[in-house]
Amino acid sequence: MERSSSSSSSSCDKVWNLGLPYPTFTLANDDKPYLITVSDDHSVKVKNVDWISKLPDDVLLIILSRLSTEEAIRTSVVSKRWEHVWNQMSHLVFDMRKNIINSNNTLDGSNPVATLITQVINNHRGHLESCVIIHVPYQGGNGMLNSWIRLLSCVKRTKVLTLRYHYGTWDRKFKTFNFSPDSLSHPSLMSLSLHSYFLESSHPLRNCSNLRTLKLLSIVAPEIGVFNRVLASCPCLEVLVLGICCFKKSRVPLKIENKKLKLLQVSSLERIDAIEVSTTSLDILAIIDICCRRDDLSLQSPQLQFNRNFWVLGPYVPHISYNISEEKSIGNEEFVNTIYGELLRPFANLYVALSVSVDLMNPTEVERLRQVLGLWTRKILELEIIFKDNNGPREENKSWDKKLWEDNNKKDPFPNAKFRVDTVWMYNFSGSEEEFALMTCLIRQGTVVEKMMIKTSTFPARKRLKIEAAVAKLQALQTKLTIKCF
């Protein structure tokens, strides 16, 4: 094994000390590598064995993926074998907050950090799937960041791009950044996240039919028309996350008319009086904070159902409506991997209201319901369950249903042993065995803390009395929980 400098040993320690189940590899005093193997009564040294360097590139890349981009690049000094491994990494993160500590630094060719980032991108030889650039306030032109965007999208064909303008304590003035026209519209770009920018016009995002995911967080525009034009230029969006603000109010609503949209998250809307949402495919609607009045939200989405509206618990309680589907969806992945985590951040809202629509006769939907509910480590304020009308053959799923609920009742709580909710509301309740089995699970496990409400008022009198009698038996199982029909 070759070493490029005397500091290689510390670099080795940093790279290899990852807690992976590999043998201990070290350097002896004579600088020759050996492997230490431990038996019951003694240690054996096997010299001149470089196990790490003998691993294939894909395994080495897994090791590098656990390091920051900066640390991964430093492994190039470990040996010849590691020299070019980093430039095959599929994900790079450039965080300039670590290197620029005052506003006198410029984001241009004279800045050594900016120059180094350019060199790293140019030297990358693999498929660069995604890239994150976090930069700080600067003086001077906009050329360097626009240059990186062109390099990543046009040359590297990067699919996922995240740009964040970070404000430090040394810079409290609002500064603007001018993206070049069409700079964010390259056909290779599938996902774009912008954080903390002033979007003067929609020109950087014209003709973005390629985009599937768009996140605009802490984005300011002069007026609502800028955002409407941006959204109109992205007809194929499947995930849309908005945290936006306008300098001035207008009577024009924010219009979201994306037919393929699967997930819509509204983190905040400031100086926006009305919202019009029209989409035929929406499965997940997450309202984290909304400032408009109830009558100023128009929602046309046939797949999304909820009865407890977003204003019942107040404007500061996040409400999520989720149509559980058996289809694989980018919306479900985004919710599980990103949005849920945002709701559990420190200082985030402690209370959440959740509405779900589910077919209990569909095994895939039930497992996905378990996944969604199982995410929550905090108690949910309200859970609304809307049972879908089931028109499928009952006999095909009967044995599966029985086994599922029996397992859940005895040894596998649904969704897990920690999930808690203050109040559960059940709609479109038909009185089926599956629905009563789910109710029994939630009651016996102590999942519901205060109330369980079942809507039966739409049923004929005879059926309503039958269901209410069955509910009364459930109430008899315990005394702490209130179970009522309405």
From Swiss-Prot:
This is F-box protein At1g80960. SMART domains: FBOX. InterPro entries: F-box-like_dom_sf, F-box_AtFBL13-like, F-box_dom, F-box_plant. The lineage of its organism: Eukaryota, Viridiplantae, Streptophyta, Embryophyta, Tracheophyta. Residues 49-97 form the F-box domain. It comes from Arabidopsis thaliana (Mouse-ear cress). Gene3D superfamilies: 1.20.1280.50. Coiled coil: none annotated. Pfam families: F-box (PF00646).
